[in-house]
Amino acid sequence: MTLAAYKEKMKELPLVSLFCSCFLSDPLNKSSYKYEADTVDLNWCVISDMEVIELNKCTSGQSFEVILKPPSFDGVPEFNASLPRRRDPSLEEIQKKLEAAEERRKYQEAELLKHLAEKREHEREVIQKAIEENNNFIKMAKEKLAQKMESNKENREAHLAAMLERLQEKDKHAEEVRKNKELKEEASR
């Protein structure tokens, strides 16, 4: 089997990498593995959790079947046998635990109330700041509007004054033309 084929099969079977333990059972008695021309010798490693069966060997490659063995629980000690038996708690211990639980509950309540008070205070500050900003905006808008109205009033008055001046000049000019015309008519008689 080539190394590339073996690696490819191992990629296809990710669980095999979890269950396979390729360690030497007795490193002193077993000869060391020799790497030869991109091949893997499956007899070199001891695989305790799986079995590899060669199915077909031909020039184009090799096929094999990997059979995972079920886990065995031989030699595993029972948990109950190793654990010491729990003794019943005394009335004083129960009372102490209840008092400690009550203190924890009160502390948690106090922390929650403190947190809520801080949150409310922060909300009040945010609302107060928003009101102040709104009032400042209204004040600035009123000032701008008053300035604009004053400017418009001044421009209008200046425009009216200029129009009146032009009308007065036209009236003067018309009066002069009339006088000149009357003088010419009297002179021509």
UniProtKB/Swiss-Prot annotation:
It holds the Pfam family Stathmin. Residues 90-189 form a coiled coil. GO terms for molecular function: tubulin binding. One of its GO terms (cellular component) is neuron projection. Residues 168-189 are annotated as: Disordered. Gene3D superfamilies: 6.10.280.30. The keyword Iron does not apply. Exhibits microtubule-destabilizing activity. It is found in: Golgi apparatus; Cell projection, Growth cone; Cell projection, Axon. Keywords: Cell projection, Coiled coil, Golgi apparatus, Lipoprotein, Palmitate, Phosphoprotein. The modification Phosphoserine is found at residue 90. Belongs to the stathmin family. GO terms for biological process: microtubule depolymerization; neuron projection development; regulation of microtubule polymerization or depolymerization. InterPro entries: Stathmin_CS, Stathmin_fam, Stathmin_sf. It comes from Rattus norvegicus (Rat). Nervous tissue. This is Stathmin-4. A lipid is attached at residues 20, 22 (S-palmitoyl cysteine). Residues 48-189 form the SLD domain.
